[in-house]
Amino acid sequence: VGVSGTGGGFKRFMAGETDISDASRYIKGKEQQGCAEAGIEYIELPVAYDGLAVVVNKANDFATTMTIAELRAMWAADSASKKWSDIRAGWPDREFKLYAPGQDSGTFDYFTETVNGKSGNCRPDATFSEDDNVLVRGVAGDPDGIAFFGLAYYVENKDQLGVVAIDGGDGP
């Protein structure tokens, strides 16, 4: 038994260190190839799907809804945005703080691909952790914190966090 993010789990699976690998995404082509090269046969068995939540500190009363373009302006690797006011006129002229799952996380892969157009495309100045509880504590303790992680972590901590409605183009 091992604990890691999805990417790390697949690395251990391909190395023969684990027999089962749960994941928050489908196995990637390079991971399929790694299994084939190692002589490992596998099956994908979807058991459940998780939601993804973008969250802010409970005291944040302005970032209640954001567009994909606004998220990209915050999270993309080439983003120069530093303050909430850089994201939307009328928001505070204070620096935001980004918290994100580690780069071995399937949640990280999904978010960066969906929001920023490429898996792994994320600015390096975020605070990264494979432990979502660390991200929860970071945002809960930082009035200008923002993070993304599995919906279950928001539900467990909604007394400390606010969830951001995402407008994908048709309204939140």
Give the location of each predicted region.
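Exported/periplasmic ABC-transporter solute-binding proteins
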Residues: V1-P172
